[in-house]
A protein has these predicted regions:
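Membrane-interface helix/helix-cap signal primarily in integral membrane proteins
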Residues: 1-213
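Membrane-interface amphipathic/re-entrant loop segments adjacent to transmembrane helices
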Residues: 152-162, 208, 384-400, 412-474
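Divalent metal-coordination and catalytic microenvironments
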Residues: 12, 116, 190, 218, ...
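Short helical patches
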Residues: 160-173, 327-330, 334, 344-365, ...
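Transmembrane alpha-helical segments that form the membrane-embedded catalytic/substrate-channel core
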Residues: 326, 373-380, 407-414, 445, ...
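Hydrophobic alpha-helical transmembrane segments
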Residues: 159-161, 165, 191-196, 258-264, ...
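Functional transmembrane helices that form membrane-embedded active or gating regions
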Residues: 3-7, 353, 357-377, 396-399, ...
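Hydrophobic alpha-helical transmembrane segments in multi-pass membrane proteins
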Residues: 199-394, 463-499
Length: 499
């Protein structure tokens, strides 16, 4: 807080650029990484109103060592504070820079010299309030720099990073142009992971109904894209190794396009292990893949374990790997037994077919409800810790919305491809309109389902932050059910799970 309003001059590497899609520069921002400290501010000379372009890093930093960046500051007091913070965060420390309205975004991957006003992130002062400082602390971000002005920039920049940055921006603009502001912003969140600018009502509606996970790039997205692409390449008779290589490369690029969040990294690692197991003709093991993903994420940065995305993503997969088998085992034999015997209809071929179809539908419905319940059981403590509320109806709602994602996501990606080709081939206008109509219909369906669910009695349970005693008791019960659950009859397992 003591640094608030201090004017700093920083140099570092530009990453994660964000530009508003309305064409203005309001809230345009980027992260500045590879920071280091230089206490002597006398070496900084501001050379004019416009940014100078230099050939190499040493000309920007004023240092002979091109591998080191300098932070030129206005007071020794600020220097000691930054030094102390950087020692805590390590060499990966960064700053979030918000540009002045008349400034253009620098190229991603370039090194720049900037100056602006320090704005520390706010800490939570009330229970339940979002802790901005803790959120950015886990991202190794020291502070925000407001009214940022760029005074120098290297000619060299990251070609792939800049391409992905421009592709992300153009894709957001295209979604809003084709689908309108509200649906376009929702589509950008689902496909690109860009929630900035999303309609606040829609965002609150999804969260209240318990389907906000659709707005996070996770295993659902990567599995649909990766598995779909891998299967398609095999169907066109490409070699399995080549199909896996192409799928891997496209998934890695897509993960970078969407920001490479924690849930995305977890899903990417697990999918790559799944592909590797197939190539080696081994059976993929879900718990092993999950453990490898956790190690790769936590070893370089242990504080990630406190991140909400990490906890929710991994707890969901734990539910799939551990709780779903416990709940589903044995229920295949229950649905067929729930049949009505009738002397008139028994033995009639048509009725037997209908009864068999009903039995299959019951088994399918039971398995999916139990799958949703199993995932919810492991995620529930973290949902209450981070959001202080839970929607019991979300278990049933997800039975409808998740299968629709298998249609929605390919339509959204297809719209990006078709809309770009329509300028060259006008015959694609009809497919483009059909894709837009299908997407808008699914979004409308989502919205109506959410409104219906939130209108039901007990749609949202406001629990507040759970006590450690409640969390401990719940965890012990969950472990006991996971360990000894298969020894119980299916009806008792379900009763224990609900309790």
């Amino acid at each position: 807080e003591a640094m608030h309003g201090e004017t700093l001059c920083l140099t570092g590497k530009v990453t994660d650029c964000w530009q508003p899609v309305d064409g203005t520069q309001e809230n345009a921002s980027f992260y500045l990484k590879d920071l280091s400290i230089e206490a002597d501010a006398s070496s900084f000379v501001f050379s004019g109103d416009s940014a100078e372009t230099t050939d190499n890093l040493s000309q920007i930093s004023g240092s002979a060592d091109a591998d080191q960046m300098s932070v030129l500051i206005s007071s020794q007091k600020t220097t000691s504070q930054i030094n102390e913070m950087q020692e805590i965060f390590g060499k990966n420390a960064s700053a979030l820079c918000y540009l002045q309205e008349d400034e253009a975004l620098p190229k991603a991957g370039s090194y720049v010299r900037v100056f602006g006003e320090v704005s520390p992130f706010l800490q939570a002062t009330n229970p339940g309030e979002f802790d901005t400082a803790a959120y950015y602390r886990r991202k190794d971000c020291l502070f925000a720099l407001r009214k940022t002005k760029i005074t120098a920039q290297t000619k060299n920049y990251g070609r792939l990073e800049e391409f992905l940055s421009q592709l992300r921006y153009e894709s957001e603009v295209l979604f809003r142009k084709q689908l309108g502001e509200k649906n376009g912003a929702t589509a950008s969140a689902m496909v690109l992971g860009r929630k900035k600018g999303m309609d606040s009502e829609v965002k609150a509606l999804y969260q209240g109904a318990g389907i906000s996970h659709l707005l996070a790039i996770s295993g659902l997205h990567l599995s649909l894209i990766g598995a779909g692409l891998f299967g398609f390449l095999k169907k066109v008779r490409l070699p399995v190794t080549l199909s896996a290589g192409i799928s891997t490369w496209i998934l890695i690029v897509y993960a970078q396009l969407t920001g490479m969040g924690i849930s995305t990294r977890r899903a990417l690692v697990m999918f790559l292990l799944f592909l590797a197991a197939g190539l080696l003709k081994r059976t993929p093991d879900l718990p092993t893949s999950l453990a490898v993903a956790a190690l790769l994420l936590l070893v370089p940065k242990p504080q990630r374990i406190l991140d909400a995305g990490f906890q929710l993503s991994f707890s969901a997969v734990i539910g799939i790997a551990v709780m779903i088998p416990v709940l589903q085992d044995g229920w295949e034999d229950v649905a067929p037994s729930l049949r009505v015997t009738n002397r008139v209809t028994d033995g009639v071929a048509g009725w037997n077919l209908v009864r068999a179809a009903i039995a299959r539908a019951c088994r399918f419905l039971c398995k999916n409800i139990l799958a949703g319940l199993g995932i919810t059981m492991t995620m529930l403590p973290f949902l209450l810790i981070h959001f202080y509320e839970w929607s019991p109806w979300s278990v049933l709602l997800n039975l409808a919305v998740i299968p629709l994602m298998g249609i929605l996501l390919p339509c959204l990606i297809g719209l990006q491809l078709v809309a770009r080709l329509t300028a060259l081939a006008h015959c694609l206008e009809l497919p483009q309109h059909l894709l837009c109509a299908a997407i808008e219909a699914i979004f409308s369906c989502y919205e109506q389902l959410c409104r219906f669910t939130t209108a039901l009695p007990g749609s949202i349970l406001h629990t507040g932050y759970p006590t450690w005693q409640a969390l401990t008791a719940y965890t012990i019960g969950l472990i006991a059910l996971a360990v000894s659950g298969k020894k119980l009859r299916p009806h008792l397992r379900l009763a224990a799970a609900v309790c």
